[in-house]
Amino acid sequence: MKRCRVDKENSFKIVEHETSWEGTEEIHRLSEEKLKKKARKIIEKNLKELSEAQELLYASNKYSLLLIFQAMDAAGKDGTIKHVMSGINPQGCEVYSFKKPSAEELDHDYLWRYNKRMPEYGRIGIFNRSYYEEVLVVKVHPELLSNPNPDETFWNVRYEDIRNMEKHLTRSRTVIIKLFLNVSKEEQRRRFLERLNTPAKHWKFSVNDLAERKKWDDYQKAFEDAINATATPWAPWYVIPADNKWIMRMIVSTIITETIQSLNLEPPKVSDDMKKVIDEARRELEKE
């Protein structure tokens, strides 16, 4: 997963990251169906390990995990969250999709509504889009700001705000994984056409999708700027090739699983008094 990781400021060029990485030569030779089958097996293995790791995360109550998914439209955020996180206990996980801010949210600073949703210890929080929209969509559409003519200093201050917030979160034992699902313009076109040609998928399409697609280059520049400004060792970005959904899901599931496992969590230790209670309860049940 090292090839996907970006953890140094000003080290990221979006054109240098593939959107259709096929992995090893062995994987490259596989047919689409065999590739999908192989990826599914790895995802299933990861799901089992992730479920066990999440149980320890919940039981130990020492860390929280924040997963951030950012991408262009049709990159597969929803499907990835669904497939990668399907095996975990829903009691220990919450997904948030941030829509247009409410009147109350607009009466606070721009990070307020995101801070309200940060996961508590023992839990996983998933942001399907996040506070990074404030330096992505808002940068492409500065008319959304009260001051529609921000200069570069304005954006640099926002990047600094985000870095400082993420530093505070990691010091407070929130582990942050930031995932940019890197889809190509041609693959986005293909997926849009698939939605338009499939009546059951019409609900996924918005006329705004085409308007935003016309700003592709602006968004790519905004992503590159944001990742360069906020990639740090404590809150790294992972740039995931997203043209093949199963490869993408396999990589994402591996990153999440390995990150939790790296915390080396253990079940809470039971006191001597509690051990006596457990022994007594066992004896009582065995007598029945």
Q: What residue spans do the PLM features occupy?
A:
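Pre-Walker A adenine-sensing motif
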Residues: 49-58
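NTP-dependent small-molecule kinase module
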Residues: 219-288
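Loop/turn-to-beta-strand initiation segments
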Residues: 63-64, 122-124, 173-177
